Amino acid sequence: KIFHTQDLCLRTNLRCAKDSARMEINLKKYIAAIGICFMALGAACIMKTDPEEVGEELPELIIGSDNYEPYNYLDDDGKPVGIDVELAEAVCEQLGYTPVFQYIVWDKKDEYLDNGKVDCLWGSFTMNGREDEYQWAGPYLYSRQVIAVRTDSKIRNISDLAGKRVAVQATTKPEEVLLERSDPRVPEVDMVYSLSGMDEIYASLRKGYVDAITGHESALERFVGNAPDMYAILDESLYISELGVAFKNDTHQDLAKKMTQILKEMQDDGTLRDMVEKYG
């Protein structure tokens, strides 16, 4: 067959026009598909605003405490447990923080706060009498500061401490009460031994270095419960402590306020009571 040049050009132009139209349709479909993908991605981003959902790490709250059963201590696996530990974990979950527990020497607690090694002190810490020294959250618990003696001791009440040797934890309320004697019930003792931790305090009574020891009732109850034939707690309490969470003064005001509200809610709904009973 003989093709005329004019016919060939016409057919070629028609084929080119069809191909061009087909490409334009495919391009529009491609652009539309991309648009749908971006819209879906945007919707997913809007929906996943929780840092945990999108895989973001929560900010850390560094909590300083010493080893003080049943409030804060290590279990057999080396994991922090106790009333204050569970409470801190529950509160931090609501606040959007990851709690990190830093064990410290308690009588150096202010240094840790001042140099920023910890954000707060959360370890059966007494608020009353220290209201202006820290930025507080709480109180969340009330605790009796009590006195433990050997069962063969003649000490039966606070007045019997006159001329006796008493072991306390350094920088705590019992130390202050015994040294300053602002309470008229407290007599002049022979010696106040200010020790760094409860293990040393318990050992001092076991070995007969002191006549009496003091501490939070829940802690001394555990000590006495392990040897009830050897030790006893006096009925008369030395002090009633309001326990709180301490931040460096004039810092973390908003966080402390929110924390106080959550702690109050946990008191009201019985959550805190259940935690305390768990560690009995």
Each model region followed by its residue ranges:
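Short, low-complexity disordered leader/linker segments with a strong preference
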Residues: 3-60
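Ligand-binding clefts/hinges and TM-proximal coupling segments of bilobed small-molecule sensing domains
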Residues: 45-49, 98-101, 173-196, 225-228, ...
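Extracytoplasmic small-molecule ligand-binding "clamshell" domains
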Residues: 52-125, 194
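Periplasmic-binding protein-like
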Residues: 65-67, 142-149, 217, 221-264
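Short, solvent-exposed loop/turn elements at domain surfaces
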Residues: 70-75, 130, 176, 254
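Extended ligand-binding regions for polar small-molecule ligands
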Residues: 82-94, 152-155, 159-165, 170-173, ...
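Acidic, polar ligand-binding/catalytic clefts
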Residues: 89, 93, 98-160, 231-237
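A ligand-binding cleft/hinge motif common to bilobed small-molecule-binding domains
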Residues: 108-111, 124-133, 177-180, 204-240
